[in-house]
Curated annotation (Swiss-Prot):
This is Carboxy-S-adenosyl-L-methionine synthase. It catalyses: prephenate + S-adenosyl-L-methionine = carboxy-S-adenosyl-L-methionine + 3-phenylpyruvate + H2O. GO terms for biological process: tRNA wobble uridine modification. Its EC number is 2.1.3.-. It comes from the Bacteria. Belongs to the class I-like SAM-binding methyltransferase superfamily. Cx-SAM synthase family. InterPro entries: CmoA, Methyltransf_25, SAM-dependent_MTases_sf. The gene is cmoA. Keywords: S-adenosyl-L-methionine, Transferase.
Length: 242
């Protein structure tokens, strides 16, 4: 059973920026399930998409792999000779725990977990690349360069799966979806104090884009097709195919 997320349950005098440290890594499975609507559906479908798009003797990347939920889902579904999965995260606490979880299960598909900045990773001969709630934590100026690097490293016909929180240019829509998301968190046991303090901690480090910005960027980079395949409130997932 996952350790309960109580990080923001008591009043904090000075709230610093949210970081993926040891405290977060310890409660991350509980935090993510109670904070992101549809997370389990996204993880399951990432495995299904990987099964469809992973090719023999290619690489599959999970960039910002955290504790490896997407990596494990893909490994369960991939059955291609010579296909390897590479998970990357810059949090030593996440990487340490992720390796333990990965090594707890045997599989014919090899997995390597690397501690590194995803902006520095060389993407090569990829059939599938996953950015599962990761791009939104990069400074906006670095996002296009990473996506261009991914595009260059993807095989023709390869797929990028990008899950993100979205903002909406229509203020009424944006506020409604934010309110619904907060209702979702309340229904999952978070208090008003926890919701408020978490929002204060994360608002300067997670800067979401509108869906149209994602689509336009995909098109400009050269992806031939892209679409939202899942959305719940202001969270969702897209694919882009080279």
């Amino acid at each position: 059973m996952a350790n309960p997320d109580t990080i923001f349950s008591a009043p904090i005098d000075k709230i610093g920026d949210f970081t993926f440290d040891e405290r977060v890594a310890e409660v991350f499975p509980d935090m993510i399930q109670r904070s992101i609507p549809g997370y389990s559906n996204i993880i399951s479908a990432i495995g299904m998409l990987a099964e469809r798009y992973a090719k023999p003797h290619s690489s599959v990347y999970d960039l910002g792999c955290s504790l490896g939920a997407a990596t494990l889902s893909m490994r369960r579904h991939i059955n291609q000779e010579g296909c390897q999965i590479i998970g990357v995260d810059n949090s030593s606490a996440m990487v340490e725990r992720c390796r333990l979880l990965i090594n707890a299960y045997r599989s014919d598909t090899p997995v390597t977990i690397v501690e590194a900045d995803i902006r520095d990773v060389n993407i090569q001969d990829a059939s599938v690349v996953v950015l599962n709630f990761t791009l939104q934590f990069l400074v906006p100026a670095d996002r296009r360069a990473l996506l261009e690097k991914i595009y260059s490293g993807l095989r023709p016909g390869g797929i990028l799966i990008l899950s993100e929180k979205y903002i909406f240019e229509d203020g009424v829509v944006n506020e409604l979806l934010i309110d619904l998301h907060h209702d979702f968190k309340r229904a999952n046991g978070y208090s008003e104090l926890e919701i408020s303090q978490k929002r204060s901690a994360i608002e300067n480090v997670m800067l979401p884009d509108p869906i149209d910005v994602h689509k336009q960027r995909f098109q400009e980079i050269g992806f031939k097709s892209s679409e939202v395949w899942f959305q719940c409130f202001n969270f969702g997932s897209m694919f882009a195919i080279k």
